[in-house]
A protein has these predicted regions:
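Conserved CoA-thioester-binding segment of acyl-CoA-metabolizing enzymes
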Residues: 1-55, 61, 69
Length: 70
């Protein structure tokens, strides 16, 4: 299951953080994927709007400190 999912709707890019079991807390993989997605969006001539959302009941609980210890 990808930690970041994207959907395009015309000129709109929907970016969904997808770690609902951790309340979408960021880990290294998610941070990197979000950075890549943002770079792709910024350099796109076709996309005008980016919407960030989270899967499940939370947008994001912040950074997953347990993943830092691993």
């Amino acid at each position: 299951m990808p930690v970041v999912e994207t959907e395009r709707h015309g000129q709109v890019l929907v970016v969904r953080m997808n770690r609902p079991e951790r309340l979408n807390a960021l880990n290294h993989e998610m941070r990197n994927r979000l950075a890549e997605t943002w770079t792709e969006f910024r350099h796109s001539n076709e996309l005008e709007v980016a919407i960030f959302t989270g899967t499940g009941r939370a947008f994001s609980a912040g950074y997953d400190l347990n993943s830092v210890a691993e």
